[in-house]
């Protein structure tokens, strides 16, 4: 077989296939309904400025149109719904009453109740504790050799355990007695110093020292009372500063 004849046969078969394919497509395009060319009047505003959009629910008997004047849709042969002009477009605005209530609602003000730190923080039924009473309680604990923070005068309740503050300060009761709260000789010198000047003034308040007699551990000096008073004044100031912070 000649190559030219084979080429002609192949070309003839391809042309027939293309013609058959085009013939099959023509009926489909012919059956597709064309949109109406004439502009219909809007049933709502009676305007001719309308256009065809699509077939509703893919049904050829329900063409859907759009009016450019009132910006609303309608379906030919359907029921007209009561749609406002603009295609049911509504702006989301806050009501005037809600806005007014927001404006009239007072904002909570941040005020300080004016309570001192011991009352506001602990408040164990001691509503009248002041800094002066706290200093008095510290002085009372100092003179009676009580551990700090366990005296009932401070508003925390009394405690009979001498180890109540040992875990906090890392010391034992024997060490506290030896140090004597910066007065020396385990408190024995305190009694002798009280006999030398029983009416010493501590923090602006007159105090009556214990008059039970000395223990024989040494002679006390008034300078030790002054130094102890300075030490405890700085301690109280440090506590008050920490409470305010």
Swiss-Prot record:
Main location: nucleus
Gene disruption phenotype: The pear1 pear2 dof6 tmo6 quadruple mutant plants showed a uniform reduction in radial growth, associated with compromised symplastic trafficking.
Subunit structure: Interacts with TCP14.
GO biological process: regulation of DNA-templated transcription; root radial pattern formation
Induction: By cytokinin in procambium.
GO cellular component, one term: nucleus
Keywords for the protein's UniProt record, in alphabetical order: DNA-binding, Metal-binding, Nucleus, Transcription, Transcription regulation, Zinc, Zinc-finger
Tissues expressing the protein: The PEAR proteins (e.g. DOF2.4, DOF5.1, DOF3.2, DOF1.1, DOF5.6 and DOF5.3) form a short-range concentration gradient that peaks at protophloem sieve elements (PSE).
Name of the protein in question: Dof zinc finger protein DOF3.2
Keyword Cell inner membrane: no
Binding residues for Zn(2+): 42, 45, 67, 70
Zinc finger residue extent: Dof-type: 40-94
Protein task: Transcription factor that negatively affects seed germination and opposes TCP14 function in the regulation of a specific set of abscisic acid-related genes. The PEAR proteins (e.g. DOF2.4, DOF5.1, DOF3.2, DOF1.1, DOF5.6 and DOF5.3) activate gene expression that promotes radial growth of protophloem sieve elements.
Polar residues bias (residue ranges): 15-26, 96-108
Lineage of source species: Eukaryota, Viridiplantae, Streptophyta, Embryophyta, Tracheophyta
Entry's localization field: Nucleus
InterPro entries: Dof, Znf_Dof
């Amino acid at each position: 077989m000649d190559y030219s004849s084979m080429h002609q046969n192949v070309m003839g078969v391809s042309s027939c296939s293309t013609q058959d394919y085009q013939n099959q497509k023509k009926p489909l395009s012919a059956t597709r309904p064309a949109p109406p060319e004439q502009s219909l009047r809007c049933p709502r505003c009676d305007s001719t400025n309308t256009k065809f959009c699509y077939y509703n629910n893919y049904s050829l008997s329900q063409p859907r149109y759009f009016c450019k004047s009132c910006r609303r849709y309608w379906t030919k042969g359907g029921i007209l719904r009561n749609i406002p002009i603009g295609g049911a477009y509504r702006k989301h605005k806050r009501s005037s009453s809600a806005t007014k209530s927001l404006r009239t609602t007072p904002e909570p003000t941040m005020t300080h109740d004016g309570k001192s730190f011991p009352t506001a923080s602990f408040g164990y039924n001691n509503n009248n504790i002041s800094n002066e009473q706290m200093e008095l309680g510290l002085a009372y604990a100092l003179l009676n050799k009580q551990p700090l923070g366990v005296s009932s005068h401070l508003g925390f309740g009394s405690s009979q355990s001498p180890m109540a503050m040992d875990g906090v300060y890392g010391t034992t009761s024997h060490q506290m007695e030896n140090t004597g709260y910066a007065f020396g000789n385990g408190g024995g010198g305190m009694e002798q110093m009280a006999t030398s000047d029983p009416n010493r003034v501590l923090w602006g308040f007159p105090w009556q020292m214990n008059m039970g007699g000395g223990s024989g551990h040494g002679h006390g000096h008034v300078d030790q009372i002054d130094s102890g008073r300075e030490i405890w004044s700085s301690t109280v100031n440090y506590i008050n500063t920490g409470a305010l912070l």
